[in-house]
């Protein structure tokens, strides 16, 4: 269930923790937000100096300390009326708080009700929301109604709508919409540093939300993840239609519902493809998705052993013991099983593997996608082999023709070669919004030309 041992992802760039690809990746994930307000390099370096590899408690302590320091700076700045400094520090405090709980998302056992997770999620959200009034866009908190089943009572999914400021809106006054879905372990406050901050500056309204199995919805409402994400995004789109009508009527703002796109990375890339089966989605950006989660989860387990298990010759208890031994020896595997335990509500490794079979694009699902699609892979991915996943996705989109499907497959870290484009957020936004501008007919001219 882990990425390949000896992954060469960090062979060409600096390692904060030599030989520990997982920790290096997660540190770079935090540092990647620095240009967009989520991290300060000196605070970052101070924190990682206090972290011991594969030790979730020193990780939590270091980032909690950084978060507290940034929060103090923010409150002092706010008291002085320096809203820009307060905004920046609140964003960093939120980012570090998210990071603090990341490695210990579960307890020392497979306890999906870890009492430490919810306070971290709430604090991450609260600090981020203190920064919202001072962003250089119109950022709004929304609640999106969602019914887990046809007959269940609706619950609300928390979301943000980032509306471009007047000076950043497109000349025709209409605002295209980008729906940004999260994935397995991100929270929507972290997503801000990638597509929302870049989108509103380019004239796009960007909507983020947390669905079942994600962020505070998992920890506060107890809703577990589901494979048919098109059901979730379908309800988000239903809400958007009413929300856009209200904005038009009350404020004269025009969200262009004929130009709605969806984007997600890693598991979010899989979710984006599921969402794109809805005809209301007119463009899809699937960043480094998986094609079949079962194939990913079992790729480093003997095929004969797995065949014996699925054929009934090996018991679930044996599978649990084998994976349990691996968890004892490998922190990354222990963390991965803990994460899936949390978002699926399943405590047995054998049951987790079975659940993975439900998360697949096999069976011709992508034939339902009719909009232009941008697909990327990561040549130095920590998790997904590009041939097994990216190219299978791209191949299943052949019905779109070469003009309506786009493939980007970078290999080096600085080119976007790490999973989810960690370390290359600026570059992925250049590619993503270039693609969307082309699909939606957005023409940009230099100010001097106008």
Curated annotation (Swiss-Prot):
Enzyme Commission number(s) of this protein: 3.7.1.-
InterPro entries in the record: AB_hydrolase_1, AB_hydrolase_fold, FrsA_esterase
Keywords: Hydrolase
Involved pathway(s): Mycotoxin biosynthesis
GO molecular function annotation: hydrolase activity
Main EC class the enzyme belongs to: hydrolase
Source superkingdom: Eukaryota
Active site as annotated: 266
SUPFAM superfamilies per UniProt: alpha/beta-Hydrolases
Record's function text: Hydrolase; part of the gene cluster that mediates the biosynthesis of the cytotoxic leucine-containing cytochalasans, including aspochalasin C, aspochalasin E, TMC-169, flavichalasine F, aspergillin PZ, aspochalasin M and flavichalasine G. The first step in the pathway is catalyzed by the hybrid PKS-NRPS ffsA that utilizes 8 units of malonyl-CoA to iteratively assemble the octaketide chain before addition of L-leucine by the C-terminal NRPS modules. Because ffsA lacks a designated enoylreductase (ER) domain, the required activity is provided the enoyl reductase fssC.
Family designation: Belongs to the AB hydrolase superfamily. FUS2 hydrolase family.
Subunit structure of this chain's protein: Homodimer.
Official protein name in the record: Hydrolase ffsE
Protein species of origin: Aspergillus flavipes
């Amino acid at each position: 269930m882990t990425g390949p041992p000896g992954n060469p992802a960090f062979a060409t760039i600096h390692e904060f923790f030599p030989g520990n690809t997982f920790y290096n990746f997660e540190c770079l994930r935090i540092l990647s937000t620095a240009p967009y307000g989520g991290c300060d390099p000196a605070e970052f370096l101070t924190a990682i100096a206090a972290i011991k590899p594969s030790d979730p408690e020193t990780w939590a302590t270091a980032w909690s300390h950084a978060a507290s320091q940034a929060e103090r700076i923010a409150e002092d700045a706010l008291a002085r009326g320096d809203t820009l400094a307060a905004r920046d520090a609140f964003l960093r405090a939120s980012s570090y708080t998210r990071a603090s709980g990341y490695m210990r998302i579960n307890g020392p056992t497979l306890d999906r009700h870890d009492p430490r997770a919810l306070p971290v999620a709430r604090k991450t959200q609260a600090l981020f929301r203190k920064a919202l009034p001072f962003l250089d866009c119109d950022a709004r908190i929304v609640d999106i109604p969602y019914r887990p089943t046809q007959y269940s009572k609706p619950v609300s999914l928390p979301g943000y709508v980032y509306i471009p400021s007047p000076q950043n809106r497109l000349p025709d006054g209409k605002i295209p919409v980008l729906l940004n879905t999260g994935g397995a372990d991100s929270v929507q406050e972290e997503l801000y540093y990638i597509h929302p901050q870049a989108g509103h500056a380019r004239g796009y309204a960007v909507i983020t939300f947390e669905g079942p199995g994600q962020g505070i919805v998992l920890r506060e409402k107890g809703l577990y993840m589901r494979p048919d994400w098109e059901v979730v995004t379908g309800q988000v789109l239903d809400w958007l239609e009413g929300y856009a009508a209200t904005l038009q009527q009350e404020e004269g703002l025009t969200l262009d519902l004929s130009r709605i796109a969806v984007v997600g990375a890693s598991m979010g890339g899989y979710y984006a493809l599921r969402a794109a089966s809805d005809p209301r989605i007119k463009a899809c950006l699937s960043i480094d998705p998986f094609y079949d989660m079962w194939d990913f989860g079992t790729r480093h387990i003997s095929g004969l052993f797995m065949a014996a298990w699925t054929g009934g010759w090996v018991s679930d208890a044996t599978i649990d013991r084998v994976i349990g031994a691996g968890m004892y020896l490998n922190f990354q595997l222990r963390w991965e099983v803990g994460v899936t335990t949390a978002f699926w509500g399943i405590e047995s490794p054998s049951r987790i593997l079975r659940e993975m079979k439900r998360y697949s694009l096999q069976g011709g699902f992508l034939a339902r996608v009719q909009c232009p699609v941008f697909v990327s892979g990561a040549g130095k991915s920590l998790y997904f082999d590009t041939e097994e996943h990216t190219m299978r996705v791209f191949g299943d989109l052949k019905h779109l023709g070469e003009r309506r499907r786009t493939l980007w497959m970078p290999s080096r870290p600085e080119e976007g070669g790490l999973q989810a484009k960690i370390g290359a957020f600026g570059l992925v936004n250049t590619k993503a919004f270039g693609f969307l501008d082309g699909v939606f007919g957005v023409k940009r001219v230099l100010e001097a030309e106008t």
